[in-house]
Swiss-Prot record:
Taxonomic source organism: Saccharolobus islandicus (strain Y.N.15.51 / Yellowstone #2)
InterPro entries xrefs: aa-tRNA-synth_II/BPL/LPL, Ala-tRNA-lgiase_IIc, Ala-tRNA-ligase_IIc_anticod-bd, Ala-tRNA-synth_IIc_core, Ala-tRNA-synth_IIc_N, Ala-tRNA_lgiase_arc, Ala-tRNA_ligase, Thr/Ala-tRNA-synth_IIc_edit
Pfam families in the cross-refs: tRNA-synt_2c, tRNA_SAD
Protein name: Alanine--tRNA ligase
Gene name as annotated: alaS
Binding, Zn(2+): H604, H608, C708, H712
GO molecular function terms attached to this record: alanine-tRNA ligase activity; aminoacyl-tRNA deacylase activity; ATP binding; tRNA binding; zinc ion binding
Keywords: Aminoacyl-tRNA synthetase, ATP-binding, Cytoplasm, Ligase, Metal-binding, Nucleotide-binding, Protein biosynthesis, RNA-binding, tRNA-binding, Zinc
GO biological processes: alanyl-tRNA aminoacylation
Length: 900
């Protein structure tokens, strides 16, 4: 959609002598006080000429620019609010905070809840990875992390705050009066904005080739069919670039110098790259507006311009600018890494963790291309020291940040050992596509830049997309939200049936200890029953749905409830059989299986206790990645970058039991969503993000508070005690804890004791002697194993000395029949194939192990063997094959010869 001219023809512009002009280059309308101006003052229509503008403001650091902006709007009736984390954990569809408006999406922007204050001002650290491949090349125009300073106003039908006129006036006053930019240099470029399902006209504020702010007037909703419908809530959504404000006041040759100051020189030194020639940098920066990173020709033209201007050889210009760009990239990426990890990101292969790992690995790749020996954590440490006053959380979580970065570097270095093997596999393809490269990165974590050198050795050419990392990030930057209908275990026809039914009154919130109740039947469909009220808790938040009985008061017939589910606000009781005696309008009595429910309540409350204990022991980066509460046990999945030690598990358990024995009060609260976020932070959403204006919180006194809709005990003493019975790493960056509490703990102790008694009987000892007896048995087994190993070595030596190969056309083929286990065989086969042109095969019935020397291909042999039927495969120089039928040595040799 394109807005009409009238959308931008503001009284403010007319009264203040702004003229509407059309840019001679991009043909976009813009407003200016300079009647002679022909260009919109945005790149690439002009070069960066802000260096030549007389700006009255003293040079501002990022911190000073931020404070100047916030103070300006505070003095003009705006309330300053704290920024949110760079991880958008109040959103289920987005991993990173990409702009200040994300702080208020979707619940404020949809009108579900009011903003925390209105109007407001904030400086929100943001991360966008869509430009990650462009960082450094444009001298600071593109960054992955930046601060979006913003003032927001939310206009309701019955409450007007301010709109276009005032917003434009504020921008003009800030830039001309507060920063001292000459009035004739300020331009407002007409544009259109869309994002997050909303849209509206916007004005881009440009000065001297630099876009300093965007003023968005959010006033439309984009419907599913692409139409635009007016919003009742009209939102002023501005974004001022804090780093660009610092840049334009300092007039440094790059934005990196304005942002990082002396850290720029320190990074060049630590990385081991000579600092770029100052004159070259200044000239290159001035012409940088001409660079469109998506068009490689513009980069070439830019460097030719620099070469011509300075009379320097083009190759020297390219080499020096390439090196500098890489250092700038590392400056940018290490700050992004620091902020991500400080806010709790754990690098992994999925979700937000994937994006964090992507930035870390790109930084490591750049260091490798620069042939630098510096450890990445050393550079991140410099960032922490530099930003600790601006972002206190980076100092608080310093140990975790540095530990996680170093661990990621060690993992990356291990992965790089696979490069030759992966390159060999890719080299066999007739064409290497972008999709192939993305798949290799996703599966193995290997950047294509590092494959390039290996593939060149094999004379394989491929085109490396300039925006590779942006393409990968785009695939992983959002998450799919499941609707309420997708989340429940009910058939489609049942879901349609309940749409007309009124919400169910939730008695379990009024009294979590209520065991029975009376209710009126609102719906009966097959074996599904809906009442006007219930104390049956529906499955949710990892807690299983209640079971029990529904009793027909007319006939006294009892129906077993086998599960309880919820769709939106309607609760569905799932019966074991169709309730033939019950119809709509009847009164029934419900009785929950109290013993089962009470076990679930204990396991649910102790889950909150253990999560807070894990944070205390492991660090604030711990986040709930999943949970399940059953009558038998509880399960909690947490994000953490390492396997837990025995000592850490013991500490978590000890803290949890201490909280239980402290008899702490457990209290549910209901609060306005924004009020809860402002008071407790977004960590209240550990267990999920509810979609309501008022949210239910669970507070364990002086220990934990988070959003939770489950049922809980009222005091931690009711839990009794807890025992962590299993700890395992279920995926990269996620640890699973399993535990039992209350009666389930007693059951576990009984079962464990029974197993100890049974094990004692099997080995012929008493339970108290079990440990010492097992040690003796293990020692005996170890002695026998050592003896077996000695015998095997003797046999292996004899075999290697006496085994004669079949020699065909300069190739040697060794056949071994039925010797030892698979691992032993593999070792012998490797030794036999240590010289070129050698094949070794171990035969055991119809199972084959095949090895080849490095100059041969095992896959060709496998392919030929499987022509007669069977299955198998391998990679590199080793394979396993199972044939459909047993073959003789001679037949196998004949097949191998065919493959050569």
């Amino acid at each position: 959609m394109k807005a009409s001219e009238e959308e931008y023809r503001l009284n403010f512009f007319i009264k203040n002598d702004f003229k509407r002009k059309i840019c001679k280059s991009c043909k976009t309308p813009f407003w200016t006080r300079d009647e002679k101006k022909e260009y919109c003052s945005d790149i690439p229509c002009t070069d960066y000429y802000f260096f030549d503008i007389n700006i009255k403001s003293q040079p501002l650091t990022v911190k000073e620019a931020r404070e100047k902006f916030l103070s300006f709007f505070e003095k003009r009736g705006h309330t300053r609010i704290s920024p949110k984390p760079v991880l958008a954990r109040w959103r289920e569809d987005l991993y990173l905070t990409i702009a200040s408006i994300v702080d208020f999406q979707p619940h404020v922007t949809s009108g579900l809840v009011p903003p925390p204050t209105n109007p407001l001002v904030v400086s929100q650290p943001s991360i966008r990875l869509e430009d990650i491949d462009n960082v450094g090349i444009t001298f600071g125009r593109h960054l992955t992390t930046f601060e979006m300073a913003a003032h927001h106003a939310f206009n309701y039908p019955d409450h007007y705050v301010y709109w276009k006129e005032e917003t434009t006036a504020y921008a003009t006053e800030f830039f001309t009066k507060e920063l001292g930019i000459p009035e004739e240099e300020l331009n407002f470029k007409e544009s259109w904005w869309e994002g997050g399902g909303n849209a509206g006209p916007c004005l881009e504020v440009t000065v001297g080739g630099l876009e300093l702010a965007t003023l968005v007037f959010m006033q439309y909703k984009i419907t599913d069919n692409g139409n635009y419908t007016p919003l009742k809530l009209k939102i002023v959504d501005t974004g001022y670039g804090v780093e660009r404000i610092a840049w334009i006041t300092q007039k440094t040759p790059s934005a990196f110098h304005a942002i990082y100051g002396n850290l720029v020189y320190k990074f060049f030194n630590k990385i081991g790259v000579a600092y770029i020639d100052e004159t070259l940098l200044k000239v290159a920066s001035r012409f940088a507006g001409k660079i469109d990173p998506d068009n490689p020709d513009t980069i070439k033209i830019h460097r030719q311009m620099v070469s011509k201007e300075l009379g320097i050889d083009i190759k020297a210009v390219e080499e020096e600018l390439d090196r500098a760009a890489k250092v700038f990239q590392i400056l940018d990426h290490t700050k992004t890494i620091m902020l991500m990890l400080a806010d709790g990101l754990v690098p992994s292969n999925s979700g937000e963790g994937y994006l964090g790992r992507l930035v870390i690995r790109r930084a490591l790749k750049v260091l490798r291309l620069l042939k630098s020996d510096v450890r990445l954590y050393e550079l991140v440490k410099e960032q922490i020291d530099f930003w600790k006053e601006d972002f206190p959380q980076v100092l608080k979580n310093k140990d975790y940040i540095l530990d996680a970065v170093e661990l990621e570097q060690q993992r990356f270095e291990k992965i790089l050992e696979k490069v030759p093997s992966i390159a060999s596999t890719l080299a066999r393809k007739s064409e290497i596509t972008t999709e192939d490269l993305i798949q290799v990165y996703d599966s193995n974590g290997i950047p294509p830049d590092l494959l390039e050198e290996e593939l060149k050795k094999k004379s394989v050419k491929f085109e490396l997309p300039r925006n590779f990392y942006a393409l990968v990030a785009k695939r992983h930057q959002t998450s799919t939200i499941k609707s309420a209908y997708d989340k429940v275990k009910l058939p489609k026809d049942m879901l349609e049936y309940i749409t007309a039914l009124q919400p169910t009154e939730k008695l379990y919130y009024k009294d979590q200890y209520m065991r029975s109740f009376e209710g009126k039947v609102l719906g009966v469909y097959k074996n599904y029953l809906i009442l006007d009220k219930t104390t049956f808790y529906p499955e949710g938040g990892g807690q299983l749905g209640d079971t029990g009985l529904i009793i027909d008061e007319k006939s006294s017939k009892r129906y077993e409830v086998i599960d309880t589910q919820k769709v939106n606000d309607v609760i569905v009781h799932i019966l074991k059989e169709e309730p033939s005696t019950i119809k709509v309008g009847d009164n029934v009595r419900g009785e929950i299986n109290w013993e089962r429910r009470y076990r679930l309540m204990r396991h649910h409350t102790v889950t909150h206790v253990i999560l807070a204990a894990a944070k205390k022991v492991l660090g604030e980066h711990v986040w709930q990645a999943g949970a399940e509460k059953t009558p038998e046990k509880g399960r909690l999945d947490i994000t953490h970058h390492k396997t837990l030690t025995e000592e850490e598990v013991k500490l978590i358990e000890n803290y949890a039991n201490s909280v239980i024995s402290d008899r702490r009060q457990v209290k549910p609260l209901e609060m306005n969503r924004m009020e809860a976020e402002m008071k407790y932070g977004v960590s209240i959403y550990e267990g999920g993000v509810p979609n309501s204006a008022t949210i239910r919180l669970l507070e364990i006194k002086d220990w934990d508070i988070e959003s939770c809709g489950g049922t809980h005990v009222s005091n931690t003493s009711e839990i009794g005690a807890v025992k962590i019975i299993n700890v395992e790493r279920i995926q990269d960056g996620v640890i699973r804890l399993e535990y039992v509490a209350g009666p389930a703990l007693v059951d576990y102790i009984r079962e464990t004791q029974a197993k100890i008694v049974e094990a004692s009987k099997i080995i012929g000892t008493s339970p108290d002697q079990l440990t010492s007896r097992l040690r003796r048995i293990l020692n005996e087994i170890e002695e026998k194993n050592n003896l077996i190993i000695q015998y095997r070595r003797i046999i292996e030596t004899e075999l290697l000395n006496n085994l004669k190969p079949y020699e065909i056309n300069g190739n040697k083929i060794y056949i071994i029949e039925g010797l030892g286990d698979e691992e032993e065989n593999k070792e012998i086969l490797r030794k036999l194939t240590s010289t070129d042109n050698t094949i070794a095969i171990s035969i055991s019935d119809n199972r084959l192990q095949i090895a080849t020397s490095k100059n041969m291909r095992v896959d060709k042999i496998v392919e030929e063997l499987l022509k007669g039927g069977g299955k198998g495969g391998g990679k590199g120089t080793f394979a396993n094959v199972i044939l459909n039928s047993k073959k003789s040595k001679e037949e196998i040799i004949e097949i191998v010869i065919k493959s050569l």
